[in-house]
Amino acid sequence: MNFGKPAAGGNPLDRWHDWKHTLSGAPASLRFIFAGIHRTVTLPFMPAFALTIFTGAFLLFQVQPLVGKYILPWFGGGPGVWTTCMLFFQLLLLGGYAYAHAVSRYLKPRTQAILHVVLLAAALASLPITPNDAWKPAAGDDPAWRILSLLTASLGLPYLVLSATGPLLQAWFRRTSPGTSPYRLYALSNVGSLLALMSYPFYFETNFTRFAQAQFWSWGLGFYAACCGFCAWRIWKNADEVTPSATAAASPAATADIPNPTAYQRALWICLPAVASTLLLAATNKMCLDVASIPFLWVLPLALYLLSFIISFDSPRWYSRFWFTLLLSAALIGVCLALFAGADMPIVQQVVIYSAALWVGSMICHGELYRLKPHPAHLTAFYLFIAAGGALGGLFVALVAPAIFNNYYELHLSLALLVALLLVVSAQDHAALSPRRWRVLAALLAVGAVYGADQAVTTVIAWLRTTAPALFSTVEYFWANTQHAGLHWPVWLAAGLLAALVALLRRRAQPLDGHRTTCGLLGLGLGGLIVVLGVQMRETSRGSLLTARNFYGVLSVQEYGQEDPSTHYRLLLHGRITHGIQFVAPERARTLTSYFGSRSGLGLALRTFPRQQNQRIGLLGLGVGTVAAYGKTGDYLRIYEIDPAVKQLAEKPFSYLATSDAQIELVMGDGRLSLEREPPQDFDFLIMDAFSSDAVPAHLLTREAFAIYLRHLKPDGAIIVNISNRYLDLRPVVENAARAIGFMSYTIECEDGSDDEEQGAWWLYGSSFVVLSQNRAFMENYALRNAASPAPATLNTIPLWTDDYTSMFRVLK
């Protein structure tokens, strides 16, 4: 594609048309973005406002992953860090919109310009935005409030000023160009936000260090301040020269004829963005929980969310309630399948399903929001309500949900609320669907309702099986033998017949009848969805002995095999991943389980180490405390754990810590930060087993992290890293770090059920450990060397991870 060069000189509009002609061969997505920019900047007085709004939006959203990546290692590296960051950004966005609304309503134009320039100068004086090390959390600090305080101190004023850019400059533009809709500027700001988000993981993160990124951002803020200052100067200079039409538009006589928004409209201005915001953060949590909390999995959902804003606010023709209701039905089926499949579904499929559901849901919320947009006289109030709704969604996911739920139910709730809101707006809109469309919609919703009934009946039968097995044995047998992939053919045969019957109805409904039928079936579909999601929530908590949720995630203790003491066991789940197993019977309570069997890399390293007495062992990540079973009399085991709920559960109902022969000391806080602050511990072994669900926090695998580990290790000691992961191949990352600190390394893999004393030990999982040491006598031990896996051909193709560079893309399996 040749972009060519616009002709020098001439009318600016001619040059824009030259660019438009040159882009005729560009991809459709690029032409769509260009078309929106072209329609915007060719309006009178628009270029200066457009450039300022675009730059402000770009900076506003690029700083989010940048600052998030800075503080991620300080707070455990889990998805809760990004959720809390998003809450901060939404609250500051609300503050910026409130400021813009207040000054545009109560201050004269010249006063507005002066005040905003003063705030711009103060924002520049507060640079740089990089957080100070003094903000690193100490043990016992509340992580959510610490993050909010940290971000307020380092980023608060610049972000507040940037947040006010869109609504304030649109209000200024409305004064200079009356009669021209300012809503295209809102779409342009979202284009800038989208480009900022997508450029970060694919360009800035991979090509520049964090320090360089922060420097570029500061320079960008200076450029933005200059552009914004120019716009303020124009408003100040022309305050007494406003066009007659602008004066008339702002006069009380003119605004008296403008209808005020109704309470119903204002309620939807809050509820629609609140549901979209909740859905955004819930989908982000789902995707980050099982892989890693990384910028790409932050920006992908946020980019889709913004894309829905761009499309919806560009033109009403992009959103059709009928077609997006159909798309939502398909997306909900996919989400239900993903929720029931759990961790067994490949991560790529999960990301696609949750991303599609997020985009469709956001399109519905923002499309309906655009339909409810007020007269431009109420523009800043409209944006203020949108920001308030977004902040409410963020507050709910970041602070309220962890306090009232014991599991991740935000996605379930947001989907149900989305369908309920769609039902509300459909009930208020009496524009009838055509008979063909409502029959198609009715058929699809009927299938959804039957699916809900299917899941409900399945749950009832499962419950009755335990309460009245004799009475329902025949029904249970029939139901089990008609099952296929979790669905039952009699139910789905009935669903197909019902759908065909509804679709083939020949009666031409009257407009009101068609409207009522559609709303009724939409309500039926909502009921079916609630049943399905309720069943899935029940399945999630089935068998749970204890459940705890906090900033770091959801922990669940489940109990199985009570009928046989020899197989009676408990397991700990973090999210959907098992983090430890222990038999309940006292004679089996010290059995090595899960990833830590005697044939695992950890077990082999501990058995073959030359010094077997009075070992000093450091452990990052407690789990249920299985490693403590290796402790012998005279050993010292120092365990670092960031999550207080893990400590409580490891002490009760699990008992590995209580029954260990070693002396055990627990240190609460992030393992890396704790080791940074402590004097050298002289460990014989330092074991890294810190997981967030199935993800390893990346900040524990960088060159700088291993340099810290080395300081706490005896000269002949060893580092053992558990890299067992279903989605990421972390072997090259750890072996690169070993070379960087001058250590030898072996990767030892173990299959499910491998045990020295018993074959087919179901309580032992397949595992992968990397053993690192500069102790040649230890590393050249035949048993250890013989168990090592050969190095793959791609081992040397992964760059060394540092605090300034990590890339999960390169290590995806």
Task: Locate predicted features.
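Intrinsic disorder/low-complexity segments
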Residues: 1-44
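Alpha-helical transmembrane segments of multi-pass membrane proteins
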Residues: 37-796, 803-813
